[in-house]
Regions:
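RNA pseudouridine synthases
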Residues: 1-188
Length: 188
């Protein structure tokens, strides 16, 4: 599904699953082949604050990669790797990354990610504070481990915990700003 409300190339969109007011839109995006947490809001300031890299809001991803990841590869990701963004090389900011066992709340993907079960895979927990186009996929590929599955688990203090796939949870502006650690601006 596309993480937008307008259709494109006949692919399913948010409009096919959620009935929300016209002024509600996704804050940030997920790639077509990614899954996980997506915020929907009608607050333009939230979009600006959350997506501005100066504010360094954390995004946590659970990443299934092909192969048994080495410590050397993890160190390279931690330090920052050079990736291509729109035809220009970009050095990613240092980040947190660790190997971990497949999270319990992650079910099997439908359709399956791959059919070659004899090749090992690894799960990574990766936390970044910037959000370039397909950044996580490019980072893991750069160190030799293509991403098979990508799940955004957390944005700052908002997580997928206690949410089923496709489930929506309403938050007040105060709750949202507190969880995202965004200070409310004073009205003039």
């Amino acid at each position: 599904m596309l993480s937008q409300f307008s259709s494109q190339d006949g692919k399913q969109t948010l409009k096919d699953y959620f009935d929300v007011p016209l002024d509600v839109y996704p804050v940030g995006r997920l790639d077509y082949d990614s899954e996980g947490l997506l915020l929907l809001a009608n607050d333009k300031r939230l979009n600006d604050d959350l997506l501005n890299p100066v504010n360094r809001h954390e995004r946590e991803y659970w990443v299934q990669v092909e192969g048994a990841v080495t410590q050397e590869a993890l160190e390279k990701i931690r330090a920052g790797v050079s990736i291509n963004i729109d035809g220009r090389m970009h050095l990613t900011q240092p980040c947190f990354v660790e190997s971990f066992d497949r999270p319990l709340l992650v079910g099997d993907r439908q359709p399956p990610v791959r059919f070659r079960k004899h090749i090992p895979d690894s799960w990574l927990r990766l936390i970044i504070t910037e959000g370039k186009n397909r950044q996580v996929r490019k980072m893991t590929a750069k160190v030799g481990y293509p991403t098979l599955r990508l799940i955004r688990y957390r944005i700052q203090g908002i997580t997928l915990e206690n949410l089923a796939p496709g489930q929506m949870k309403m938050l007040s502006q105060t709750e949202l700003y507190n969880l995202l650690q965004i200070k409310k601006r004073q009205s003039l």
